[in-house]
Amino acid sequence: PHIVCADLSRFLEDISETFIPLADSYKIAFTYSIAPDISIAYFDKNILEQVLYNLLSNAFKYTPDGGSVSFSASLEQSSSDAVMTLRITDSGIGIPPESLPYIFDRYYKGASIAFRRSESSGIGLAYTKELLELHKATIQCESELGKGSVFTVALPISEEAYPEEWLEYSEPKMEEVSLRESVPLEETNSVPENLRQTLLFVEDNEDLCRYCLLYTSDAADE
């Protein structure tokens, strides 16, 4: 992880606003709320952007036209650490009770469902959970079949929550985030150039491509 000190409120607002055109096109009521006490914080922009992109995209994917999706961010302050709570709520198809314990397992697709806007690889939520674990964060889901789901993320945002070697104190100018079809992973490969090898991976599923990139990059660093 590359933890920087940045304006978290603006970062969350920028990401939220990129989903407004998508909501309009599907006639889905989309709302977002960011608590006023969320401001400057410590977090990995790349990880958090990918997590929110995946969770919000899933919410829209499984919510029929005319439904609703909401995103909220609040702050919980303990004696030592500040933890941000993110909630993504949708009025979509929901998750069957028998599938709920397994939704963060790799390649788990669950039962066939009546509505979704695109096919799933079964790794999107597993990928999201593993990204969050890299960030010392947790994720959980509550869902009711036919009524929708709520995904809750608890993310530490204080300097003290992270090892010194993760912290980057020089913060470049924040760039405006944009909704895109693919969220590239930041390159972390530290293998010397003359020892690197090329792996050709042919796959048209974006989630699977991102997931394989994550693991091949990790393997190269070992």
Model-derived features with residue positions:
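Conserved small/polar residues in nucleotide/adenosyl-binding loops
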Residues: 215-221
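A conserved beta-strand-to-alpha-helix junction within the catalytic ATP-binding
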Residues: 2-17, 29-31, 49
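Short conserved segment of the HATPase_c
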Residues: 95-107
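Glycine-rich ATP-lid/hinge loop adjacent to the conserved G-boxes
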Residues: 108-119
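Glycine-rich G1-box
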Residues: 21, 93-94
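Conserved micro-motifs of the catalytic ATP-binding
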Residues: 1, 40-43
